[in-house]
């Protein structure tokens, strides 16, 4: 799959969207050559170049090397998402269909040189979900080392691309908030103190990513990056207005994503202390994890909402496939139980 993505994304394989490739690679090329970010050297895709530049310098900073690196990162993200599906879903037929859909759909649609969506805005979705699920399964989520690695991953995702990184950070924070909701009811102080800690950690993660980016830019000979510049283009309404289109009419894919997202969020709160007041509620955290997938999907979909070209809905492909697979697996399990009973 990595090879397939590499061939399809090769700047030599097609002349379609080469300007997009130039726009994406230019920032990396500048960083590799030590050019700091400034008003004349900026970009709307985030500070991914600061992460890619050291790797490219190590293995060779040419275009071909860059394409291979992006293909490898993309393949790793797909494998991470496949790991989540294989571990969450018990029915083998659903597993096979979900993993196949995960790979084939994106690869078949990816016919031009356009890194800005896949893998740029989907890369950390698979990686962060896989790491969180690993922690949930192994019960590592509150281990100090696990949390430190998690925060580092989230900071890197924010530096890579702010508009998706902040969604991933909020989604992971949502897991810990939901876990508190499962443990405590409204009358218990732990609900509020622990939630406050999570919110402060969320703010600290974003602030940490900003400070690290600013320091690196200063070390490269530039100025410290302002918070407005760091989160661009989210504070620039003209950028979004320029790229706004009409939504598709009728029953379309984004409604399916929205339905499953709201379903899994509703499910986790229905099975919480806020609803039942039951202190002996099941300690399983898989429904909380699925709520994280849902939050991530709905948050990522804001990219599509602001740029409603149909192909941009690919940004929620990972999360939507996971939600549909888990829902289908749940339905099959219940059908088999009712049939056996």
Label for each model-derived stretch:
Residues 81-109, 141-146, 227-229:
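Transmembrane-helix signature of polytopic, membrane-embedded enzymes
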Residues 98-99, 125-126, 134-157, 186-194, ...:
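Short hydrophobic alpha-helices at membrane interfaces in multi-pass membrane enzymes
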Residues 167, 305-339:
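Hydrophobic/aromatic-rich transmembrane helices and adjacent perimembrane loops
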Residues 96-108, 293-298, 323, 327:
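Transmembrane and membrane-interface helices of multi-pass
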């Amino acid at each position: 799959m990595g090879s397939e993505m590499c061939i399809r994304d090769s700047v030599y394989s097609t002349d379609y969207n080469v300007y997009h490739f130039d726009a994406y690679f230019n920032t990396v090329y500048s960083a590799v050559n030590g050019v700091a970010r400034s008003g004349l050297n900026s970009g709307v895709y985030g500070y991914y170049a600061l992460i890619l530049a050291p790797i490219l310098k190590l293995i060779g900073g040419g275009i071909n090397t860059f394409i291979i690196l992006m293909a490898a990162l993309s393949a790793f993200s797909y494998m991470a998402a496949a790991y989540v599906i294989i571990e969450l879903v018990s029915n083998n037929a659903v597993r096979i269909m979900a993993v196949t859909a995960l790979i084939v759909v994106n690869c078949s649609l990816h016919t031009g040189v356009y890194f800005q969506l896949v893998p740029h805005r989907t890369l950390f979705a698979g990686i962060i979900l896989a790491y969180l699920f690993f922690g949930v399964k192994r019960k590592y989520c509150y281990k100090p080392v696990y949390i430190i690695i998690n925060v580092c991953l989230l900071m890197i995702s924010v530096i890579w691309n702010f508009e998706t990184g902040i969604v991933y950070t909020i989604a992971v924070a949502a897991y810990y908030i939901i876990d508190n909701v499962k443990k405590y009811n409204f009358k218990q102080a732990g609900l509020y103190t622990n939630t406050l800690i999570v919110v402060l950690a969320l703010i600290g993660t974003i602030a940490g990513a900003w400070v690290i980016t600013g320091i690196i830019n200063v070390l490269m000979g530039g100025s410290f990056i302002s918070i407005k510049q760091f989160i661009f283009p989210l504070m620039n309404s003209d950028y979004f207005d320029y790229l706004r289109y009409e939504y598709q009419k009728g029953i379309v894919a984004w409604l399916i994503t929205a339905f499953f997202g709201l379903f899994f969020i509703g499910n986790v709160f229905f099975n919480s202390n806020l609803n039942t007041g039951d202190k002996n509620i099941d300690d399983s955290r898989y429904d909380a994890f699925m709520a994280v997938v849902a939050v991530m999907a709905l948050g990522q979909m804001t990219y599509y909402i602001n740029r409603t070209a149909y192909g941009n809905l690919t940004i929620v492909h990972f999360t939507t496939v996971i939600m549909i697979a888990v829902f289908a697996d749940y339905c099959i399990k219940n059908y088999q139980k009712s049939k056996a009973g």
